[in-house]
Amino acid sequence: MKTKSIEMTLLFDLYGELLTEKQQQLFDLYYNEDLSLAEIADLLQISRQGARDGIVRSENLLREFDEILKLSSAMEQNSQIAALASQIILSTESDEVKKFAEQIKSLALSQGGIYGI
């Protein structure tokens, strides 16, 4: 999968509900169903340019939402914290340290780490 597709899919998972139903539909057909602009236009009985404009508008809105709310950044940070906690768990022999590291990892993942979604 392309980097842009991964980024857009992640942003859609976070903010997709903020888009209109039509924008959600266009996004889903393009990114999740992997339809071409021509196929989307034919299916929805709109122009190819209309399909493209709707998808681009959806992408821009998702990026704007993330710029304001910064959920993807927080999620990435929580994933990094969880990964570091996992390293601590593997590298220490202290049961007490392992216990605290497990708690940190669990908290980070429950707050939206990549693996906690």
Question: Which residues does each PLM region occupy?
Answer:
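Intrinsically disordered, low-complexity basic tails/linkers immediately adjacent to helix-turn-helix/homeobox/MYB/SANT
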Residues: 69-97
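C-terminal flanking helix
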Residues: 59-66
